[in-house]
Design a protein with these regions (language model features):
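M14 metallocarboxypeptidase catalytic domain recognition
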Residues: 1-402
Length: 402
C-alpha cells in the first residue's frame, strides 16, 4: 500500500484529498489504525488524527494513562516532507511484522496529526488566514493550534516530534536541523529528556544513515557554531510549549533545497531525501520510547508534580526571557520571588475561559473575579499567559504574592 508520493518515486507530493483517501483506506485495511477528525479549518477541511496501536489503538483515556508518541506532520503547509513521512510511518507501523515494533505498539499509542490542510492545499506556510500556526500555541486563535493543544491535553503524550523543513544557506546546510525546548520555565528533567531524544536518538538515527545533522538556528563554520539566528525560547512555538506542559518535545527540520549536484539535477531525488530525513528523525523518537517508556511515563508525571509544588510554595524562579543556555540580562525579564497565582477580572476570565480550558489551566471563582493558582502542572506557562512582562501574554492578570 503505497502513498501517491511513493508511487511517483518522489516526483509529486501527495495532495490533501489523496491523503484523506489514503488514510481512509489504511483505516479500513488495518485494525491497528483509527482515523478521526479532531477539528475543522475555517474552510471546513478536516484536521485528522491517526492513532496506531496493537492489536488496536487504545482508547484516549487508556492511552493517556499509558504511553503516547505524537508527531505533528507539517504544520507549515508548504513543508511537504513531514506529511509524507507521517503517512509512510503510519502505514509501516500498521503492517509491521517486526516483533520489537509489534510489542512497542502493544504498549504505546502512536499519533500523527496533519494540522494545516488549508495551507497544504494552498501551498502556503500559514493557514488560510495567513497565520503561522507555530506562533499560536499560547493565544490559540486558530482552529489548527486549538486542535493540536487539545490533543496534547487529552492524550497526554510523553514525547512529541514536530516535523518541518528549512531553507539552507551558507553555514546552515545540513540534511537535518533539530532542537529541544529552550524556554527556561521548562522542568529541567523534561528539558534534558527532550534534548537526549533530539541529539542521541533522532539526530543519531539520521546520521547513522549517512546524512548530516546540526542544531537548529546555529550557523556553523569549521565545525563550530558562531551565531544563533533562530531557535529561542518563545512559549508560543510548539517545541517550547510542549516542554512547558511536561512533554519531551523537539523540532525536526530538513533542508528543502538541493544540497548537492545530484539533487539539483533531480527534484525527485531531493524530495525523497527530504522525506527520508524526517522519517529517520521520527524513527529516532520511536526508539527513544522503546528504550525509555517507563522512565518517560514516570518523569512526565514527576515534572507535573514538581511544578505544582513549586507553584504552591513560591519557590524557584519564573523567567520571561532568555533560553536554556542564556540567562536574562534585564530585571524585568525574570522574577526571583515568584507569585503564587494571578487574579483575573470576571471580564478577563470570560475572554480567556475557553483558551485556558484547552491549555488545561484551572482556576476558581473569588471576590475579585477569578484566581489562577500556579500550584498546577502548567506553572511554567501561566505567567507567560498573564504577566505584563511576558511579550506574548494573552490577557492582563495581576500577580498575587505567596
Amino acid at each position: 500500500m503505497k502513498t501517491p508520493f511513493e508511487t511517483s518515486n518522489g516526483a509529486a507530493w501527495t495532495t490533501q484529498p489523496q491523503a484523506v483517501r489514503f488514510l481512509r483506506d489504511l483505516d479500513a485495511a488495518s485494525e491497528r489504525v483509527r482515523v478521526q477528525t479532531v477539528g475543522r479549518t475555517l474552510q471546513n477541511r478536516p484536521i485528522q488524527l491517526v492513532a496506531v496501536g496493537a492489536p488496536a489503538p487504545a482508547t484516549q483515556a487508556a492511552a493517556a494513562a499509558g504511553s503516547v508518541v505524537l508527531f505533528t506532520c507539517s504544520v507549515h503547509g508548504d513543508e511537504n516532507s513531514g506529511r509524507e513521512a507521517c503517512l509512510q510511518m503510519a502505514r509501516d507501523l500498521a503492517f509491521t511484522t517486526d516483533a520489537a515494533l509489534s510489542r512497542f505498539l502493544e504498549r504505546t499509542t502512536v499519533l500523527f496529526v496533519n494540522p494545516n490542510p488549508n495551507g497544504w492545499v494552498a501551498d502556503t506556510r500559514g493557514n488560510a488566514e495567513g497565520v503561522d500556526v507555530n506562533r499560536d500555541y499560547m493565544a490559540l486563535a486558530t482552529p489548527e493550534a486549538r486542535a493540536i493543544v487539545k490533543i496534547i491535553r487529552d492524550w497526554r503524550p510523553d514525547v512529541l516530534n514536530d516535523l518541518h523543513e528549512f531553507g539552507p544557506g551558507e553555514f546552515y546546510d545540513t540534511d537535518l536541523l533539530h532542537l529541544w525546548p529552550r524556554n527556561r520555565n521548562v522542568d529541567p528533567v523534561m528539558h534534558d529528556l527532550a534534548r537526549e531524544m533530539s541529539e542521541e536518538y533522532s539526530s543519531a538515527q539520521v546520521t547513522s544513515l549517512g546524512y548530516s545533522s546540526g542544531v537548529y538556528g546555529q550557523l556553523v563554520k569549521d565545525g563550530e557554531p558562531f551565531r544563533q539566528v533562530a531557535g529561542d525560547g518563545q512559549a508560543r512555538i510548539l517545541r517550547n510549549y510542549a516542554g512547558l506542559v511536561n512533554v519531551a518535545g523537539m523540532l525536526s527540520e530538513t533542508a528543502n533545497e538541493a544540497l548537492d549536484d545530484a539533487e539539483e539535477a533531480d527534484a525527485s531525488l531531493l524530495n525523497r531525501r527530504r522525506v527520508e530525513v524526517n522519517y529517520a528523525s521520527a524513527a529516532g523518537s520511536v526508539q527513544m520510547v522503546i528504550e525509555n517508556r517507563d522512565l518517560l511515563a514516570r518523569e512526565t508525571a514527576a515534572a507535573a508534580a514538581r511544578h505544582t509544588e513549586l507553584g504552591r510554595t513560591g519557590d524557584g524562579v519564573i523567567y520571561f526571557a532568555g533560553q536554556d543556555d542564556m540567562i536574562p540580562t534585564a530585571a524585568n525579564q525574570v522574577e526571583p520571588e515568584p507569585m503564587c497565582g494571578y487574579q483575573l477580572t470576571a471580564a478577563t476570565f470570560t475572554q480567556v475561559r475557553a483558551t485556558l480550558a484547552l491549555h488545561g489551566v484551572t482556576s476558581r471563582a473569588d471576590a475579585g473575579g477569578r484566581y489562577v493558582t500556579l500550584a498546577q502542572p502548567t506553572r511554567g506557562l501561566i505567567p507567560l499567559l498573564f504577566d505584563s512582562r511576558s511579550q506574548y501574554k494573552i490577557a492582563d492578570g495581576t500577580p498575587v504574592a505567596c
